[in-house]
UniProtKB/Swiss-Prot annotation:
Coiled coil: 821-888
Residue ranges of the motif 'HIGH' region: 43-53
Catalytic activity: tRNA(Val) + L-valine + ATP = L-valyl-tRNA(Val) + AMP + diphosphate
Keywords (A to Z) from UniProt: Aminoacyl-tRNA synthetase, ATP-binding, Coiled coil, Cytoplasm, Ligase, Nucleotide-binding, Protein biosynthesis
Gene Ontology cellular-component annotations: cytosol
EC top class, as a word: ligase
Species of the source: Gluconobacter oxydans (strain 621H)
Lineage, broadest ranks: Bacteria, Pseudomonadati, Pseudomonadota, Alphaproteobacteria, Acetobacterales
Motif 'KMSKS' region mapped to chain: 538-542
The name this protein goes by in its record: Valine--tRNA ligase
GO biological process, one term: valyl-tRNA aminoacylation
Length: 888
């Protein structure tokens, strides 16, 4: 006997452990079956589960579970990412609390501590994913720095280097002065900041001045030119002239370049190639030098400009510039501005809002910095990836993301793959005393290249975390070895990921997969949105609207959490999720449990010899027909990644068709104990089994519990996706039950609109009903009476009864006499008053939405909320007017 209620905590852990021990999630590359494989987007080893992870992994798990049911040979490859800078930061913080540091330990000692930390805490997110029900093949779990992947990374690096696709170059990078390392664009967050725009006059040699506007006066020490637009008439005769740079006395040219915008500032801009990405490009176009004036800690540094410093009375002072050396950029800025003001070269200061780049990890202000780094020729590697998308070898879902992919790929830059960290894949390059580089998979091979007696020192840098991640689809399957798994599961079937890493990860996996495997890494890229709160706002700690998925699992169960995520996931849109949504979906789980319990109490038991084609009763044939529709629609929805439509289809069939109608219609039959009773018991048990199989991908715990407890045959984790059944006279059964359901539903609506008390039964009169519908009303009189609170069903001629509400159902007019049930005059007055109130609300909201100023200034979620309110009010108004019309 089923328990009174389903308590997820009583079942989830035991079920999951049993599945894992039985090998239910294990891949079998040596067995038949069409392969279907998905690779984990490897979460950071430092990570803990958040709602973004939950969305991503629930969608993957649903596809994996569904494909297992369909008989595919499935691999869901799990693993975690070493997360270079994130992990190093976590361990450095721990060391700081202990009163020591990375440098105090030394490289080897520090790396030992990181591995210890990984061993102790690195499995947290994996354990949490198990709590969510993720059915990955955990025995195959990989780590981006395990021995096999490390060997593969070294081989890829050496191969690309030998092909000329990896090289060293001096270029601008995003520099984190706290970690003293280059970082990727994805690790940079722009914060809007209130700052200043300084207008500084630069004197020309001929005595004139040109005013430049800048937000970074301290970097003027590294200026190498002033740029103006070639068509800006104000400066036409200055192009080619020489400017004497204030403070330093250095001579720099005025150049013509399209980078300058005549409409912004003064139209003249200072060019500092070593400290601005746009200026770097201007410098290349004009063959300008690029002196660095900020060191690795973002302090002023004058070594590269010192030889050119000179004193110019009233303009420049070598002694002053020397005092700036070693100052922080902020203090240096103050000193530079003060000196310019003292010398009267500062024209004015204006308040200015600007986007300041901050490091995602640690929060330091990021600097563009010119450094010698290792680069990968992404432009060359990108060609086959672009062709793969254009030819349809790889499809994006939704298709709109292909445009984003192409936009990024059109402007692809060399990929900086080196990082000045200790935790990560150390670059397999060694240097002789003369600086000559030897690239090899190990030091022994490098020594062979260098020759005996040459002392070698390995490069101190490590590879960008995204480099090893780009190899994930094939290295996790054993490459460079020719493994059974690699032959069976590559290319993978679908990649599920967020839009923010299409370039950083997705595109790079395409490049590497095509280059080393000569095939795409996946056939489909499924892009999902972000998880937002119920009002559509981004979740954040500062807003206090964040949700911990494990808290949701603990309170509502993994099934309810998964179902809420699934139901909210539509193509190309963010998902709104809150506690209320999850609670609503827990109600669904409860509804399913209660229905199963009711059927069990009424003798419904699964039978292996049940034949749907032999069912005689209209009710039985109808629910089997509805089940066929649900199976078809659910399968179609999953096949096109419409998780929201899958959830909606299941919800509609289970909650409405099965629980609200079929179970309710069945109650008197179960009580009667006749031939139809036995048939309906068999039908209900069979359909419940179909529901459990249909919904296993999204709510695996409650479905598995019911399958086991109710005695369905076979292991639940091995069951197949339900097949379409043969149902005799299906259309006839559908027409009959649909008519009865619409009649009951319409009568319920009228009763609600008329405020008829539930305790008061009302007669029902039909006029002009077709003979088959009169027969249906007679056959289903008990159900109509019980479910629509109807005292009896009769027929009326041409004379309509007075004071009756009326509705139209197909060819028939249905009357509900109201005399004695309600105070008709009072009800008319109530409806009229409510109509007036609703019309007033509609007017207020309409005025607000018609106000262009409101729409422009209000937050998008506020505008959306008002549109929703307007739609609700308009719906209410239609309903109220219909009710009043029925009383007229």
């Amino acid at each position: 006997m089923l328990e009174k209620s389903f308590v997820p905590a009583d079942h989830e852990n035991a079920l999951y452990d049993a599945w894992e021990k039985s090998g239910a999630f294990r891949a079998h590359p040596d067995q038949p079956g069409e392969p279907f494989s998905i690779m984990f987007p490897p979460p950071n080893v430092t990570g803990t589960l958040h709602l973004g992870h939950s969305l991503n992994f629930v969608l993957q798990d649903m596809l994996i579970r569904w494909k297992r049911q369909e008989g595919f040979n499935v691999l869901w490859q799990p693993g975690t990412d070493h997360a270079g800078i994130a992990t190093q930061m976590v361990v450095e913080r721990a060391l700081d609390k202990e009163g020591t540091s990375r440098t105090a330990l030394g490289r080897e000692g520090f790396l030992e501590r990181v591995w210890d930390w990984k061993q102790e805490y690195g499995g947290t997110i994996v354990k949490q994913l198990r709590k969510l029900g993720a059915s990955a093949d955990w025995e195959r779990e990989r780590f981006t720095m395990d021995d096999g992947l490390s060997r593969a990374v070294r081989k890829v690096f050496v191969t690309l280097y030998n092909e000329g696709l990896i090289y060293r170059d001096r270029r601008l990078v995003n520099w984190d002065p706290k970690f003293r390392s280059a970082i990727s664009d994805l690790e940079v967050e722009n914060h809007e900041t209130k700052g200043s725009m300084w207008y500084i006059r630069y004197p020309l040699e001929d005595g004139r001045t040109i005013t430049v506007a800048t937000t970074r006066p301290e970097t003027m020490l590294g200026d190498v030119a002033v740029a103006v637009h070639p068509e800006d008439e104000r400066y036409a005769d200055m192009i080619g002239k020489t400017v004497i740079l204030p403070l330093t006395g250095r001579r720099i040219p005025v150049v013509a370049d399209l980078h300058s915008d005549p409409e912004k500032g003064t139209g003249a801009v200072k060019i500092t190639p070593a400290h601005d990405f746009n200026d770097f490009e201007v410098g290349k176009r004009h063959d300008l030098p690029a002196p660095t004036v900020l060191d690795e800690t973002a302090c002023l540094w004058i070594e590269e400009i010192r030889p050119e410093l000179r004193d110019v009375e009233g303009l420049a002072s070598v002694a002053f510039v020397e005092t700036l050396n070693g100052l922080s950029r902020e203090e240096g800025r103050k000193q530079v501005v003060a000196e310019l003001e003292r010398l009267e070269w500062l024209e004015k200061i204006e308040p200015h809002k600007l986007q300041v780049p901050h490091a995602e990890r640690g929060g330091a202000i990021v600097e563009p910095r010119l450094t010698l780094q290792w680069y990968c020729d992404a432009k060359t590697l990108s060609g086959p990836a672009v062709e793969a998308v254009e030819s349809g070898k790889i499809a994006f879902e939704p298709r709109q993301w292909e445009n984003t992919f192409h936009a990024w790929m059109r402007d692809i830059q060399p990929w900086c793959i080196s990082r000045q960290l200790w935790w990560g894949h150390r670059i397999p390059a060694w240097y002789g005393a003369d600086g000559k580089v030897y690239v090899a998979e190990n030091e022994q091979d490098a020594q062979v290249q260098a020759g005996e007696g040459v002392s070698l020192t390995q490069d101190e840098d490590v590879l960008d975390t995204w480099f090893s991640s780009a190899l994930w689809p094939f290295t996790t399957l054993g490459w460079p070895d020719r493994t059974e798994e690699l032959a069976r599961y590559y290319p993978t079937s679908v990649l599920v990921t967020g839009f923010d890493i299409i370039f950083f990860w997705v595109a790079r996996m395409m490049m590497m997969g095509l280059h080393f495997m000569d095939d795409v890494p996946f056939r489909t890229v499924l892009i999902h949105g972000l998880v937002r709160d119920e009002k559509g706002q981004k979740m954040s700690k500062s807003k206090g609207n964040g949700l911990d998925p494990l808290d949701l699992v603990a309170e509502f169960g993994a099934d309810a959490t998964r179902l809420a995520i699934c139901a909210g996931t539509g193509p190309g849109r963010d998902i709104k999720l809150g506690r209320k949504r999850v609670e609503e979906h827990r109600a669904f789980v409860t509804k399913l449990w209660n229905a199963a319990r009711f059927l069990e109490m009424n003798g419904a038991k699964p039978t292996e010899d049940f034949d749907p084609a032999s069912v005689k009763s209209a009710l039985g044939r109808w629910i089997l027909t509805e089940a066929n529709d649900a199976i078809t629609e659910a399968g179609r929805a999953l096949s096109v990644y419409r998780f929201d439509e899958y959830a909606s289809c299941c919800y509609r069939f289970v909650w409405s068709r099965f629980c609200d109608w079929f179970v309710e219609f069945s109650k008197p039959v179960f009580a009667a104990e006749n031939e139809e009773t036995a048939e309906l018991r068999a039908v209900s048990a069979h359909v419940l089994g179909l529901i459990l199989r249909l919904m296993q991908p999204v709510i695996p715990f409650v479905t598995a519990t019911l399958w086991q407890e109710l005695g369905y045959p076979g292991k639940f984790e091995e069951i197949r996706w339900p097949e379409i059944m043969t149902v005799t006279r299906a259309d006839e059964a559908r027409a009959e039950l649909d008519w009865v359901i619409r009649l009951i539903g319409d009568v319920r609506t009228v009763r609600s609109e008329m405020n008829i008390p539930p305790s008061q039964k009302a007669p029902l009169l039909l006029r002009d009903a077709a003979p088959e519908n009169l027969e249906r009303a007679k056959t289903w009189a008990e159900a109509i009476g019980r479910m629509a609170r109807v005292s009896d069903v009769g027929v009326v001629g041409e004379d309509a009864p007075r004071n009756a509400a009326q509705l139209v159902l197909d060819e028939a007019t249905v009357f509900i006499p109201l005399e004695g049930l309600i105070d008709l005059d009072a009800e008319r007055a109530r409806l009229a008053k409510e109509i007036t109130r609703i019309e007033g609300e509609i007017l207020k909201v309409t005025r607000k939405l018609d106000n262009a100023d409101f729409v422009a200034r209000a937050k998008p979620e506020v505008v959306e909320e008002n549109h929703d309110r307007l739609a609700t009010f308009q719906s209410d108004l239609e309903r109220l007017k219909a009710a009043l019309g029925r009383l007229a």
